[in-house]
């Protein structure tokens, strides 16, 4: 599974097929909802198995299954299952409505958008995981959207943007740890360089949300705040911020929702089971997409698709700026092919370090570029865990969210400008 692979352009065919079917067909039809993403992945997965050099058909299928059953993929599936169960049980006991009422009563109308973005930034920065932040805040964001009339995909995109901010900067984020270790620099030094690039973007996005929020007016709710029903979300946030494993966090949230529901009389024991079952079923499509993507991307790796990208990106580098651009492109393509920014960093980090050493790129700058571009791509691809999770919890499509992802897009632009204009100067000369 992990042997050296020869660069092979044709190994990228499944990815090209997927993009062609899903994006081009949708653009031709003028409707992104007409092409189910599951069908696009099914076709591209069949192509991946058909063109693979893995030997007999049963061996190629076995290779595909091993990719789908990768430990990272299985962990994502477990999180999706628990997240679906928690979201539905919290909704059934009234925890979502109670939390939304609390947020609407505390935050002025004009601060709803900016407040949600800042909350997502702070939570993800504290807990070091974008997925955990999305799990915790998306149901609340959807509830606020429903009660205020705000566009639901827009509200969910705010949460995703804030979640990617923390994923990029947090000291305890997997991406920060891998980026600094592979480049050989301290976390605090990487944080300084990274902050100079992305914090101005976060401030700009917050200002944009403040202006957009100034037009929002809500009708004061006559419903009193049910503090007891807010407890499941408070527990989830506190345990997440304390660094508890996200699966334990979700299990505690599910149990707490049941206890609160029984105490308040809003749900019976068997209704709790039914709510969990419904929530898990709602994640079915998301899980199918994740498994198909995992298998397809493993076939691409096995047949040399990623090796081909790495070879092409590192062949013609001749300057420090070119080296930084190749590092950015390298990790971006790796993430595009793996849909996992941590894995993308592990794959591209050693190569990026070699490029940085040969052309005199500051390790702090290369670590920042690796982390930032991996989070940029991860935050916008429709088959990444973040958008899939957010879309699943909000019952919308990833494409519906993508058009409103202000922060991830601007983060990518800012990182590209930092390369082109040699910023920050101290770490670019």
Regions found by a protein language model. Name each.
Residues 110-123, 149-166, 322-335, 359-380, ...:
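Alpha-helical transmembrane segments of multi-pass membrane proteins
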Residues 32, 161-164, 168-223, 228, ...:
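Juxtamembrane and boundary regions of transmembrane helices in multi-pass small-molecule transporters
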Residues 4-7, 27-40, 67-71, 103-108, ...:
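Interfacial loop-to-helix junctions that mark the boundaries of transmembrane helices
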Residues 9-21, 33-53, 76-82, 228-239, ...:
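Hydrophobic mid-bilayer segments of alpha-helices in multi-pass membrane transport proteins
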């Amino acid at each position: 599974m992990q042997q050296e692979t020869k660069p092979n352009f044709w190994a990228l065919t499944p990815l090209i097929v997927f993009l062609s079917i899903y994006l081009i067909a949708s653009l031709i039809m003028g409707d992104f909802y007409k092409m189910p993403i599951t069908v696009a992945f099914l076709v591209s997965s069949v192509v991946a198995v058909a063109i693979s050099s893995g030997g007999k058909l049963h061996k190629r299928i076995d290779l595909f299954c091993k990719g789908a059953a990768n430990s990272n993929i299985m962990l994502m599936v477990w999180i999706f299952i628990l997240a679906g169960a928690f979201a539905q049980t919290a909704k059934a006991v009234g925890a979502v409505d109670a939390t939304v009422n609390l947020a609407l009563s505390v935050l002025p109308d004009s601060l709803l958008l900016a407040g949600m973005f800042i909350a997502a930034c702070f939570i993800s920065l504290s807990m070091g995981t974008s997925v955990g932040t999305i799990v915790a805040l998306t149901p609340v964001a959807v509830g606020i959207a429903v009660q205020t009339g705000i566009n639901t995909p827009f509200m969910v995109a705010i949460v995703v943007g804030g979640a990617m901010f923390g994923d990029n900067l947090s000291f305890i984020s997997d991406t920060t740890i891998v980026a600094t270790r592979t480049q050989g620099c301290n976390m605090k030094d990487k944080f300084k360089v990274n902050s100079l690039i992305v914090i101005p973007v976060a401030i700009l996005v917050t200002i944009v949300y403040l202006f957009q929020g100034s037009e929002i007016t809500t009708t004061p709710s006559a419903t009193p705040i049910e503090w007891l029903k807010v407890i499941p979300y408070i527990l989830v946030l506190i345990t997440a911020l304390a660094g508890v494993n996200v699966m334990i966090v979700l299990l505690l949230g599910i149990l707490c929702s049941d206890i609160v529901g029984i105490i308040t009389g809003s749900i019976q024991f068997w209704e709790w089971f039914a709510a969990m079952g419904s929530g898990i079923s709602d994640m079915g499509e998301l899980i199918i997409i994740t498994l198909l993507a995992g298998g397809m991307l493993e076939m691409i790796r096995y047949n040399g698709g990623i090796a081909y990208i790495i070879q092409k990106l590192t062949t013609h580098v001749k300057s420090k700026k070119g080296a930084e651009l190749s590092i950015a492109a390298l990790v971006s393509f790796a993430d595009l092919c793996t849909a996992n920014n941590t894995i993308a960093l592990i794959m591209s980090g050693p190569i990026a370090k070699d490029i940085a050493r040969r052309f005199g790129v500051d390790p702090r700058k290369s670590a920042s570029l690796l982390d930032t571009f991996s989070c940029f791509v991860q935050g916008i691809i429709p088959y990444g865990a973040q958008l899939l999770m957010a879309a699943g919890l909000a019952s919308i499509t990833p494409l519906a969210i993508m058009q409103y992802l202000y922060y991830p897009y601007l983060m990518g632009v800012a990182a590209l400008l930092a390369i082109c204009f040699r910023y920050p100067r101290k770490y670019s000369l």
